Amino acid sequence: MSFSARMALCLAALAACSAPAVAEPLRAIYSIRGGGLQVMQVEAVFELDQPARYSIRAQWRTTGMARLFGGAEFSGGTEGRFVGGEARPTRYAVEGTWRGERRQTVLDYPGGQPVLRVRLPPDNDGREPVSEAMMRGTIDQFSAVAQLSRMIATNGRCDGQAGIYEGVRVVRMQARTAGRDRIFPWSTAWTGEATRCSFTCQQVAGFKADDDARVREPQEGTAWMASPRPGAPPIPVRVEVPSRLFGSLTVYLMEVDGVAANALASNAGSSDARSATGAPPAASRAP
């Protein structure tokens, strides 16, 4: 899986759903780190308060040494409806630059099925075309995690699956509940107890001719979900995915509504947590 695809996977993990009484957007800043350095920053706005509607918007850009592998700066998001507990996107749009080249994708969903309205560059970077049959029934990556998170908000579990298509490739994603963990403190990142969701993603369409066999292999990751502050909906507070360039990538929730995330954790500083000076393993199993 390419570096940009792994960034999308990280981003795919940065969304959640719940139903608090007051409909207020939740603004979050995430740091994505690999090899001990920040490689990307993400600013996200979650509007997940309505029982039947959702909207997720984000801006993300590569930082530091990651720019050596190709600078990227993007913005966009999705909006949609919940039908029977399932996310049904109505529009997905992302635009920005990758290695100095303009990129844009717009998907609409008439009749609930994805239709690619805009794709730049039009040659799709030399990838094989994705057939309508492979697109059928898919949703975008933000909506996929919104659906997963709605299940967590409803029953405390994250067991589910989805086909993800963002205009380039099709990925099958399956998630499963893996218990509860204590998130280790690091810098100003959120710390506390969270639900652990293990997930598997496997690309099944949209390959390049020169992709090696590893691109087709299942990729395992973990997302830890929790309410970042009292009264807020649960969102990803830490995420880990593998990376060929950096070994692994870790996503840290650093700020919520303009406040350092570690200052908002309702159970931060408890006897189960410990301090750290570097980027530690994400969590330890809760007793």
Regions flagged by a language model, labelled:
Residues M1-L9:
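Bacterial N-terminal signal peptides that target proteins for export
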Residues G112-G179:
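A charged, solvent-exposed segment within the mature domains of Sec-exported extracytoplasmic proteins
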Residues E24-G111, T154-P287:
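Acidic, serine/threonine-rich low-complexity disordered tracts
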Residues A16-P20:
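N-terminal signal peptide c-region/cleavage motif recognized by signal peptidases
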Residues C10-L11, A21:
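Cleavable N-terminal signal peptides
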